[in-house]
Amino acid sequence: VFNVFSYLTETHISVYEVEQGTIAVNNVYNGLILRDEKIINSDYSGAVNYYVKEGSKVAYGDLVCSIDENGDVSNMINEASQDGSTIDSENLAEIEKTINDFLYAYDGKNYYQVYSFKDNVNASLSEALSVNALNDISDYVASAENNNTFHKVITDVPGIVTYYTDGFENVTVDNFTAAMFDESNYSKNDLKTNPAIQAGSPEYKLIDSEYWNIIVPVPDATAESLKDDDTIKIRFLKDAKEAYATYSIVGRDGQQYLILSLKSA
């Protein structure tokens, strides 16, 4: 085991364990994750409802959210989505699988997993209830669409949906700065906390590339020890999954950086 990394992602915090060789060196580093993120801005102003949970993959033509200019249909969706009895067997089976998978893989040493699991189940429930609510009032939806006051937001490219902005959307391996590794400077704007949206403002964010990077500042000695190789093994402490990453070492303003390159499965 070579190192343990915590890096900025999601809230931009997660943990990796990086393995190289056979000697364990349990150092912890802060790192920055960079993905190809595109902010999708709204064409309309109104009440917003979301139908895809954070971190879900979407295909071309999938429904992500809806904008209701006068709010009537949105209120009906919100009211109908409070009824848990409307969850169909398919969605219920998916939620049960999520629970069973968590119970099977749960490790008491990583109690933080409970919070992630809770958020995931709540998001799945919210997604299922909102979609069912939308279908249950299809006549009202169709009427509002005909009146051009209700708008479904459909994806035009596949990718992974997220609902926050943080100012890192245009950061690359070529333009990152040392200040970006200071977590005290990090702030995140949660798009789902606002029940209404203005035209031209962000409604969601799409990650449309399977390639991504983690940038980690490392001591000179570490950079020197890695210079003769280009591949490293990573174990995700969150779920114990493992992956291999290629890497390069870059020096900038007197600091050495390990740049990990990964491809999502």
Segments and roles (model prediction):
Residues V1-T11:
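N-terminal export/targeting signal detector
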